[in-house]
Amino acid sequence: TADDYVIYIDTDSIFASAVPLVQKRFPNQELTETMMTQRIMEICGEVQDYLNKSYDYFAKKFCNIDKHVFDIKQEVIAKSGLFITKKRYGLRIINDAGRKVNKIHVKGLDTIRSNFAVAMKDLLQNVLDDILADVPKEKIDERISVFKRNMTSLHYDVMANPIGVKGIGKYQVKDAESVF
């Protein structure tokens, strides 16, 4: 719905849009990226405290235990994200554990797979960077078109899948004149 904040949930993670919460809490304010990050951290701190106190209550009331080890904490603030499927996403992180950063975090996408062609990984990483930087679609399409036009001039080492055959040295050609 229009009021949904949660974007992605996994076993131990939740990604939510804090922008609607900030806009509701601080209406009619023009916020710089730094101010927006500070406001998000304030709200995250409140949510974190509330959830952790709820776990204290839950542990005592429903499990009859005084102490539990479950602890919620805010880890990153991302300016943008691309969520494909479960455990496959990319984030442009601007704050990591309270430190200002500008980095891309990738989970499960082909840009980090070791058995994916280097040229394709580079292209996909550049396209992901463009998407997360809100580059217009036309410019991204042009990047892909240029890559496709230049593919035939790329060396096979960067176009081939970087895989090997285990124990290939034990296979030898018996007849030097025979192709097979």
Where are these regions (language model features)?
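DNA-dependent DNA polymerase catalytic subunits
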Residues: 1-11, 18-180
